[in-house]
């Protein structure tokens, strides 16, 4: 077992009850284009078209052969575009149960499938997009093969669902998904889970991770087991996508059901709910939000995105909806007050005297932008074998060569989310990292 000691379990109120409930009926779902890094769509549908679940709605001209399919059957009601005609979202109003039928196999046949059969079924169904690469965190090319595949069956994000609870009702599907994934690599499938979690491990090498966040991030697992580099590409996939892959191959139908957490300080009743990929967050949170100004976030409070306008839908890789108070008020001489109701990793406030207390955190950054101050905060929350202060300095200054030499290629934005949270200078290091990775990929 690998125990993560450097990191932070965010003491934020509003954790969900670990019991799965049925969510509200969803009337609209959306595929969000900007979630797929570097993707440039070739549209196969237009507003007003009727689509079946699993039907191709666009393909990626930058990554030929990668297909994106409809999350539900119904009518395309919106195709939203932003600056420079970047695809923001394709919205479908759900109607009927029409679905494309894909190849299906008996569970006993999965071990004898060829890599080509597996690859084709994943591509045609759109489930290929569940896979992501390191470096760069992109959907892999359809003819690529990884050095290994990491299955993330642990989640240490604040307010996350317990993966073992979700998998418990789908153990056969999960095991079948692992068998299928093993066909895509000549290396190993690495199943990463919490210590003692009852999770099937068919055809996979098991690694247990304990300790504080980011013990549950794929970047942490990859770093300690099979580090990614310019010459070594690995893939990772979430546990609920593994379940969906297993169901795809045994039923021939695309399963877009997901279990997510609706939680946060402004959640009326934080809990786990069953819903659909791409579900309307407005519908999901009806009756779930406390009074006042609230920011709805798709994903974790550490690395989610504001869900408004054309982006007001559950993200493809998100398993949480976080509800936070929209705090726009400035606190007079707040820096000098005792702060018994505030959290600080540097013990700047009296709140540290209650180590088990949960705080009603808001969207406030606690001050304006300022210079990057290296006072040891980054080292406290970075468990990877890198020099965080030096790396972050190079990212901010635009020194791409220096950042790559210090390990930037191993990372994704979520791996630097804690550094952003504890930064006195209020820097969003994830955006700097993405700029660095884009430069490396563009210039080779």
Swiss-Prot record:
One of its GO terms (biological process) is sodium ion transport. Keywords: Ion transport, NAD, Sodium, Sodium transport, Translocase, Transport, Ubiquinone. It catalyses: a ubiquinone + n Na(+)(in) + NADH + H(+) = a ubiquinol + n Na(+)(out) + NAD(+). Its EC number is 7.2.1.1. It comes from the Bacteria. InterPro entries: NqrA, NQRA_2nd, NqrA_C_domain, NQRA_N. GO terms for molecular function: oxidoreductase activity, acting on NAD(P)H, quinone or similar compound as acceptor. Pfam families: NQRA_2nd, NQRA_N, NQRA_SLBB. Composed of six subunits; NqrA, NqrB, NqrC, NqrD, NqrE and NqrF. NQR complex catalyzes the reduction of ubiquinone-1 to ubiquinol by two successive reactions, coupled with the transport of Na(+) ions from the cytoplasm to the periplasm. NqrA to NqrE are probably involved in the second step, the conversion of ubisemiquinone to ubiquinol. Belongs to the NqrA family. This is Na(+)-translocating NADH-quinone reductase subunit A.
């Amino acid at each position: 077992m690998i125990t993560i000691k450097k990191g932070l379990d965010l003491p934020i109120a509003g954790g969900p009850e670990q019991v799965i409930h049925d969510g509200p009926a969803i009337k609209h779902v959306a595929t969000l284009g900007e979630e797929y890094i570097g993707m440039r769509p070739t549209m196969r549908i237009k507003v007003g078209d009727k689509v079946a679940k699993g039907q191709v709605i666009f393909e990626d001209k930058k990554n030929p052969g990668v297909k994106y399919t409809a999350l539900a059957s119904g009518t395309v009601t919106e195709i939203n575009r932003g600056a420079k005609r970047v695809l923001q979202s394709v919205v479908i109003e759900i109607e009927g149960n029409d679905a494309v039928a894909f190849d299906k196999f008996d569970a006993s046949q999965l071990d004898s499938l060829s890599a080509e059969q597996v690859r084709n079924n994943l591509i045609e169904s759109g489930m290929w997009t569940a896979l992501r690469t390191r470096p760069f965190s992109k959907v892999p090319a359809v003819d690529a093969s990884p050095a290994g595949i990491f299955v993330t069956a642990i989640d240490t994000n604040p307010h996350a669902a317990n993966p073992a609870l979700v998998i418990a009702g789908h153990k056969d599907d999960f095991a079948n998904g692992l068998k299928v994934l093993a066909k895509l690599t000549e290396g190993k499938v690495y199943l990463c889970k919490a210590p003692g979690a009852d999770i099937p491990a068919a055809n996979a090498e098991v690694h247990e991770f304990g300790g504080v966040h980011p013990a549950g991030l794929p970047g942490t697992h990859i770093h300690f087991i099979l580090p990614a580099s310019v010459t070594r590409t690995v893939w990772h996939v979430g546990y609920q996508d593994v379940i969906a892959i297993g169901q795809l191959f045994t039923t021939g139908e695309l399963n877009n059901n997901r279990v997510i957490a609706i939680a946060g300080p402004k959640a009326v009743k934080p809990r786990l709910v069953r819903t659909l990929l791409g579900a309307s967050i407005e519908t999901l949170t009806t009756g779930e939000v406390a009074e006042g100004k609230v920011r709805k976030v798709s994903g974790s409070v550490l690395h989610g995105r504001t869900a408004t306008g054309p982006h007001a839908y559950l993200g493809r890789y998100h398993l949480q909806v976080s509800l936070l108070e929209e705090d726009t008020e400035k606190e007079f001489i707040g820096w000098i007050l005792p702060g018994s109701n505030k959290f600080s990793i540097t013990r700047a406030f009296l709140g540290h005297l209650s180590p088990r207390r949960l705080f009603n955190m808001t969207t406030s950054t606690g001050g304006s932008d300022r210079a990057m101050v290296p006072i040891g905060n980054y080292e406290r929350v970075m468990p990877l074998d890198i020099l965080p202060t030096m790396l972050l300095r190079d990212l901010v200054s635009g020194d791409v060569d220096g950042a790559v030499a210090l390990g930037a290629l191993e990372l994704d934005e979520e791996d630097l989310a804690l550094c952003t949270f504890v930064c006195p200078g209020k820097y969003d290091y994830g955006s700097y990292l993405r700029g660095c990775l884009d430069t490396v990929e563009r210039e080779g």
